[in-house]
Amino acid sequence: MPLSYQHFRRILLLDEEAGPLEEELPRLADEDLNRRVAEDLNLQLPNVSIPWTHKVGNFTGLYSSTIPVFNPNWKTPSFPDIHLHQDIINKCEQFVGPLTVNEKRRLNLVMPARFFPIATKYLPLEKGIKPYYPDNVVNHYFQTRHYLHTLWKAGILYKRETTRSASFCGSPYSWEQELHHGAFLDGPSRMGEESFHHQSSGIFSRPPVGSSIQSKHQKSRLGPQSQQRPLDGSQQGRSGSIRAGVHSPTRRPFGVEPSGSRHAKNIASRSASCLHQSAVRKAAYPNHSTFERHSSSGHAVEFHNIPPSSAGSQSKRPVFSCWWLQFRNSEPCSDYCLTHLVNLLEDWGPCTEHGRHHIRIPRTPARVTGGVFLVDKNPHNTAESRLVVDFSQFSRGSSRVSWPKFAVPNLQSLTNLLSSNLSWLSLDVSAAFYHIPLHPAAMPHLLVGSSGLSRYVARLSSNSRIINHQYGTLPNLHDSCSRNLYVSLMLLFKTFGRKLHLYSHPIIMGFRKIPMGVGLSPFLLAQFTSAICSVVRRAFPHCLAFSYMDDVVLGAKSVQHLESLYTSVTNFLLSLGIHLNPNKTKRWGYSLNFMGYVIGSWGSLPQEHIRMKIKDCFRKLPVNRPIDWKVCQRIVGLLGFAAPFTQCGYPALMPLYACIQSKQAFTFSPTYKAFLCKQYLNLYPVARQRSGLCQVFADATPTGWGLAIGHQRMRGTFVAPLPIHTAELLAACFARSRSGAKLIGTDNSVVLSRKYTSFPWLLGCAANWILRGTSFVYVPSALNPADDPSRGRLGIYRPLLRLPFQPTTGRTSLYAVSPSVPSRLPDRVHFASPLHVAWRPP
């Protein structure tokens, strides 16, 4: 006869009609009873032969990916021009006086952030954009390219120009070494004096650093190229004769970098293309040797900057290798040939764009180190997309980076800190990760990009067609033409217009701000926001500012005070270059929603949406069917979040933890499911701990227990000797039930830790319920007044200690000790300070 739910509740002492606690509770530590109950509830984990269940409601195993849904109408979010002030420490010091060592250390960590992986694996460009949506390959390609372009325009990415140089938009930092080695040479007269090594057919002179130049005609590069004149005949002749075997175009691209120390072969392979393009091509077209098959393939390098206006005269020119524009000269192969699309516009714009600033970078290969793809911005906002960057290579394998640990406030610390009668609001930092600048030295390790549309499509469509009559001049150009591609591009043409041409070229980009896909980023963001909040708290001592990652909350005594605080703090953050999203500022009144909890003066509870998820989970939980342990991980993750608010807490979930650890399937018996259901139906708030003096002490030996409650002493013995930790836990439970005190002194570290998961299962569950809301103070055995009674000696009285208890706020480093602050004029308005009135700082 399996154990009924009512009987089980009685065993667990959750019902009123249990006998005296001193008799009942030690029985729960009995191994035999625990084994029998576990067998009755099917908690021992036999090897089950029934097939496992791999899905419960929305929960699948941790590593099985849910199929993402592609939205062709995703909007790319816009990013403000985020530029964090470089002298952020000085700015803060002007605001609040000298900073503490802690704050300075944290702010120095992120100005700039550095990234040193042990080893970096480079992937071919084809893996730059992940084929995550096989039915929307082309659409996803362009949406992702557009997202990357938007990030580059916002100064969040570098664009790799050559092996050793990159360009970016936005304001430069002092650690980004700009290249100013020479200016655009206006006419041929000055070039005649240059030696061959320092110039090559219309490039500016420069010393042999592998880098590109910021020229004074940069803007013309992006618009119609009116200021670029063709070279005169003498120059062309000269460059042609020097560069034997290299086809010399009539126009030269910008910023190409022949290096003085290298020979003609190297120059041919590197300088005959726009900034980074030939290197990209070498990666993208490994089957064409850049040098030997230069004029025949038309694939090896791209000659950009052919004025779009000269479409008519292009037939007389040599074939240029921009894949997109090549269609202009070719015969349509079918009704769905890309030639029809390319001929829609006269001016397709430049093949490549360059940033306002050019900087020197460490040697960066034409490869990527992580793939990117798009997903919904969040479950509530499916209209906008979010870029997911997969840099998981740095968290895997033998060369994985062990990311720094940082303090996450636990539930009790949070409650101690934020549970008060303050008014709250939370600030939304827009694109928080993209505030923190990365040193350019990290660029070679954090590369994203794409191989260009032609390669991307070719890799995905295996059935390439070769059209014989065109073989020879334009090999395989029309292989990519297909109805699907044509229709997709025509639709995308409405969205992106002539940018289709720009986006169809290969590109390699490195991160200039910290990306979200690296384990270092959460750590850096947490350090940064906690330092800023520490500064804000000292500037406004009568208020509370607290942050976890990009979630910043402000609290004040009254709504009017909160509004004036909001204005001041917002202005301060804006002056540092931190961008806030005013539309997403939330005013919470007296119950703050933070980190999944609702925190008010009564304590904390889980937010409503989490309660709904738990209800939903129990509704779909199958009984008497083995459930895959990976699904159990998901279930435990959800239930574990709300466990501190239940009667029995984490110990109630121990059978599930055990099955996950042994990688076995778990079967819910009706009684165990009913027990958990009831546990999660009524949630109790976790209250703030109060400081006070400890008056109640407990102690135990394996054979007996003793209590000191004020001047009263009590003792008792156990029927059979018990392990010492179990005995100490029982003594603490007796102290709580006898005295009702919320503060108990004990000399046992396991009881102090309040983790009851290692005790016999039934005892752990019952003790959690009895000791809920109790705070413990450590008292050394020698001074413990309950020590003598536990050894059976009631006559000797040790003096009662005056042991003060201070609630902790964990390692959340809330209170920085303020150095002396220069005196300021007194505030005209005096607000009653919550620090003095509402609660004491720990």
Curated annotation (Swiss-Prot):
Residues 178-345 are annotated as: Spacer. Its EC number is 2.7.7.7, 2.7.7.49, 3.1.26.4. Pfam families: DNA_pol_viral_C, DNA_pol_viral_N, RVT_1. PROSITE patterns: RT_POL. GO terms for molecular function: DNA binding; DNA-directed DNA polymerase activity; metal ion binding; RNA-directed DNA polymerase activity; RNA-DNA hybrid ribonuclease activity. Residues 346-689 are annotated as: Polymerase/reverse transcriptase domain (RT). Keywords: DNA replication, DNA-binding, DNA-directed DNA polymerase, Endonuclease, Host-virus interaction, Hydrolase, Inhibition of host innate immune response by virus, Inhibition of host RLR pathway by virus, Magnesium, Metal-binding, Multifunctional enzyme, Nuclease, Nucleotidyltransferase, RNA-directed DNA polymerase, Transferase, Viral immunoevasion. Residues 223-239 have a biased composition (Polar residues). Activated by host HSP70 and HSP40 in vitro to be able to bind the epsilon loop of the pgRNA. Because deletion of the RNase H region renders the protein partly chaperone-independent, the chaperones may be needed indirectly to relieve occlusion of the RNA-binding site by this domain. Inhibited by several reverse-transcriptase inhibitors: Lamivudine, Adefovir and Entecavir. Residues 1-177 are annotated as: Terminal protein domain (TP). InterPro entries: DNA/RNA_pol_sf, DNApol_viral_C, DNApol_viral_N, HBV_DPOL, Rev_trsase/Diguanyl_cyclase, RT_dom, Viral_Replic_Matur_Polypro. Residues 186-273 are annotated as: Disordered. The record marks 63 as: Priming of reverse-transcription by covalently linking the first nucleotide of the (-)DNA. The keyword Hydrolase applies. It catalyses: DNA(n) + a 2'-deoxyribonucleoside 5'-triphosphate = DNA(n+1) + diphosphate; Endonucleolytic cleavage to 5'-phosphomonoester. Multifunctional enzyme that converts the viral RNA genome into dsDNA in viral cytoplasmic capsids. This enzyme displays a DNA polymerase activity that can copy either DNA or RNA templates, and a ribonuclease H (RNase H) activity that cleaves the RNA strand of RNA-DNA heteroduplexes in a partially processive 3'- to 5'-endonucleasic mode. Neo-synthesized pregenomic RNA (pgRNA) are encapsidated together with the P protein, and reverse-transcribed inside the nucleocapsid. Belongs to the hepadnaviridae P protein family. This is Protein P. The gene is P.
